[in-house]
Amino acid sequence: MSGAIASSPAATLFLAGSSSSSPRRRRSRVSGVWWHLYGGTGLRLHWERRGLVRDGAVVCSASAAGGEDGVAKAKTKSAGSSKAVAVQGSTAKADHVEDSVSSPKYVKPAVAKQNGEVVSRATKSDAPVSKPKVDPSVPASKAEADGNAQAVESKAALDKKEDVGVAEPLEAKADAGGDAGAVSSADDSENKESGPLAGPNVMNVIVVASECSPFCKTGGLGDVVGALPKALARRGHRVMVVIPRYGEYAEAKDLGVRKRYRVAGQDSEVSYFHAFIDGVDFVFLEAPPFRHRHNDIYGGERFDVLKRMILFCKAAVEVPWFAPCGGSIYGDGNLVFIANDWHTALLPVYLKAYYRDNGLMQYTRSVLVIHNIAHQGRGPVDDFATMDLPEHYIDHFRLYDPVGGEHSNVFAAGLKMADRAVTVSHGYLWEIKTMDGGWGLHEIINHNDWKLQGIVNGIDMAEWNPEVDEHLQSDGYANYTFETLDTGKKQCKEALQRQLGLQVRDDVPLIGFIGRLDHQKGVDIIGDAMPWIAGQDVQVVMLGTGRPDLEEMLRRFESEHNDKVRGWVGFSVQLAHRITAGADVLLMPSRFEPCGLNQLYAMAYGTVPVVHAVGGLRDTVAPFDPFADTGLGWTFDRAEANRMIDALGHCLNTYRNYKESWRGLQARGMAQDLSWDHAAELYEDVLVKAKYQW
């Protein structure tokens, strides 16, 4: 993409695909019921892959679409649609075929009741689908008339595939065959009758990130990118995740597509790999700078990291046209990109500078998710020359820092160019508007306040559910629900004590800590409080890796208090699950925490959190009120050892002397709907706002 866009083969296709002036949503009257078509051929094929097409028609209930009862069927008239179906194969119309690569069936978390009431964070989860949102600028008659025009556009786009390098090699067809003919999770059997949960707001969604669990992960960002797309797909959206291919991923098949991009005077060839898992397309971009970085995603010199992210974003913004998934590309109609943190904040910038400023991708929108604003892609102003952007765009990057002076800031430019932005909690949204919490970007954030929304993360209940957790199925551990909490959690606690060589005692409170060993996570606050903690009748298990001095601190604690403290330096997914299940209390003294996931995992497992009331911790852990018998844990208001000791002391007293109150804390924690389903509904609202933003 380093050259002039107007001369590239891609430009021809973009112009052909964006000639219609109306949004990619059509509606026509069929048998007295509204029948909705979205975004051209690609999204329709996605529904066929998920078993939602019968006799050539998209099955959509009237309740989901806001119309009459019943299900409408209509024959496909578009030649483009017919051609696309043919590409995908004769099995595309199968009503339902088991997905050979899907994860274990989603299991609803155990629901606990207290005083006859169920506590749930997601009060809207069972609310009826809202009425469809219609663009008032497009009359119904015009929308119907444009339907034929869109069919021509879709066909033209497919006919152009050879021109833009979207070949159909054997590898791609074999991969698409597995996707198109057999697809999706058990939940689709319900959606087949009722239509997509998103109703008329179904879109093409491309999530772009530098990491994604289980392929590559360094922290919470990887967990979010691994779970949110699946939740959006369950709502009926066609969803793709784009990440670098750091290693050899067995699931990924080579699409046979190659593109070259120039960064800092060097050409890099990017290869496209694809997998279809849990109803989501995963596209992996392979290039020399990404190879063999599986365990060192953000390693290397600052400028080398920047060049990798420039290459990644340049390639990712073109994925809708060059990555055929299930036999069809996503295209630029009815499309929203979701970029994550500074690593992909250049994507909204390239989308605007390369395409929308030139009349292309006019129906494509971008959303930027802020997971941690402390990392911003800062560098000297000279970095701008590496980004291959029009000269006037430098003003979007230039930022003055009272400490470091004038510099280039990637996150700042991304926030300005994105159509919408999301923070991972309401509390964090408030914090980043302040001088202390905004890390130099507070003025930009306040100026763009209208486009920001806070949405608390969910957790992947296929992985973090004590009822089905695979890490609790051996070595003396046990799966459990709220109904079997007394025996199951006790068994996990005893197994953890044995595994780590601690005295097996059910009466002693076991305190856990899981996290990076750095200043943000506040592990040094635990260090300051350790003399007091060691003087209590408790056991402590700490798991993490990070700063060498803090790693040494963990080893020293275990050496000095070998009868009650274990410090595991390193990281083990299995041990993290087992600590979450076996501990009675989870400590999170983070100095700042955009959302936090460990406290959510803990509550789902009946483990009571003690947290510093910042960011998402304040949003998700309501303080215990012994008089009203409400709350989920204990909070403290300053990142200081004495404040943490005070909160932890009250927690331990309740554990020992007020068993009924303790049981209530566990019940309320486990009763919450902490899944991604509610968060996905809120993200969908943001996507809709972006879609209709002009």
Swiss-Prot record:
Enzyme class: transferase
Highest taxon of source: Eukaryota
Compartments reported by the entry: Plastid, Amyloplast; Plastid, Chloroplast
Annotated binding of ADP-alpha-D-glucose, by residue: K217
Functional note: May contribute to the deposition of transient starch in chloroplasts of leaves.
GO cellular component: amyloplast; chloroplast
Principal cellular location given in the protein's record: plastid
One biological process term in Gene Ontology: starch biosynthetic process
Documented EC number(s): 2.4.1.21
Catalysed reactions listed for this entry: [(1->4)-alpha-D-glucosyl](n) + ADP-alpha-D-glucose = [(1->4)-alpha-D-glucosyl](n+1) + ADP + H(+)
Span list, region Disordered: 93-197
Expressing tissues: Expressed in leaves and weakly in endosperm and roots.
Transit peptide residue numbers: 1-15
The UniProt record lists the keyword Glycosyltransferase: yes
Protein's UniProt keywords contain Iron-sulfur: no
Protein name per the record: Soluble starch synthase 2-2, chloroplastic/amyloplastic
Pfam family of the protein (one): Glyco_trans_1_4
Pathway(s) served: Glycan biosynthesis; starch biosynthesis
Family: Belongs to the glycosyltransferase 1 family. Bacterial/plant glycogen synthase subfamily.
Basic and acidic residues: bias regions: 156-176
Record key words, sorted: Amyloplast, Chloroplast, Glycosyltransferase, Plastid, Starch biosynthesis, Transferase, Transit peptide
Alphabetized GO MF terms: alpha-1,4-glucan glucosyltransferase (ADP-glucose donor) activity; alpha-1,4-glucan glucosyltransferase (UDP-glucose donor) activity
InterPro entries in alphabetical order: GS/SS (IPR011835), Starch_synth_cat_dom (IPR013534)
Biased composition (Low complexity): 127-142, 177-186
